[in-house]
Amino acid sequence: MSNRSGYRGYIGSRPYFGERAAQHVQNLVIRDYCQRNGHPYLLSATEYAMNGCYMMLEEVFRELPRLEGIVLYSIFMLPRNRDRRRRVYDTVLSSGAVMAGALENLVIRNEQDIRVVEDIWVIKLLTETRTDKIVV
Amino acid sequence: MTQNLERSPFWTDEEWTLTQSFLDQGYVIARTESPDTLERIRTHVAKAACGHLGLDIPADAGKFLDDIAAHVDPSTLNDLRLAVINALRSADWFRPAYLALARQSLQTLVGNELAMQRGIGLSVQLPQDDSSLLPIHADVWDGDSSFEVVQWVPLVDCFGTKTMYIVPPSEDRAVQKTMHKMHDQSAEDLYNAVAEKAVFLDLKFGDILLFSQTLMHGNRINVEDTTRWSMNCRFKSIMSPYAQKKLGEFFEPITIRGATRIGLDYSLPEDFDE
């Protein structure tokens, strides 16, 4: 029998791609995802507000051997740097856990899933616009 | 945190002493301004816990809360915590009572037009329980504004690992300045970097802690024999900047003064012809 138990939520304190959701709303989305998928939900870790900081994600990695998975509020909370994202995927999958994005209802269990998420990420980066630069 | 603050002649001695202490340490601990109110809150908490657990109301609420581990374990703790929080939040007297515990100190440190966190937090930390830990953090890293103060109220005596720790301003600022170098490390690594400097705050029931949540703080596994019960709530000046914790969804204005009320409602006469 597995010693793993539950899915740790992971929410943010800063905007991602210029978008912000209140923390209790992020938690509602994660709870709903876990409920719909029959996953035991564990109270979320909250990432620090500083851009480029993933120390709370690293903290969650420390308990990966005891977790079934991590549920991010959104896959766009992952690091913007491709190599750092790759390290996140590798860390989670090599530990035997899975990772999900609750908002997008996407789960990463294997290389194929990573490709799907990476395609979305690359397109998002390419199409990223700043509304303050749009001239009408 | 702010060095060489010169005393303005507008400060009273009492205000100046409190402010200096707050700036030097990043926190102040004072006896509650309303002991009866604090006792009322603690009794309400104990009754709510008894109601949830199906127990008789205890004669000594403090001892009952200290020894709550006789009635719950980590797997049932969160249900108890939620039941007590719901009982507090549904009592319409509770939030004004919470303010009354340190009203004068808050007015000195924060201002007299206050915004108050809408949902007051409750921590219950059983002995040896590793499921209720709060990793090292500063609330400003979690979306709070640097203009806020946390009012932390113990419902039992808190000491040793039963209490929270805080990192003193000088060490805190030095570490925050170079924190980016720890970008691929965890919060636990960060704690290890400041552990020797962390101060575990000794508070008796009746003490109120006001601290700047720009300072790193958190808790560790409670290895004392009794359970920690504490409440926390953030206050800020209504007109000071907000971060991710917004007015309305997180904060509520509670003491809008008359002149501000008039100012908020007033608009200049309009529709003059040029």
State the predicted function of each range.
Chain A
Residues 1-136:
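Short, structured surface patches at the beginning of a domain
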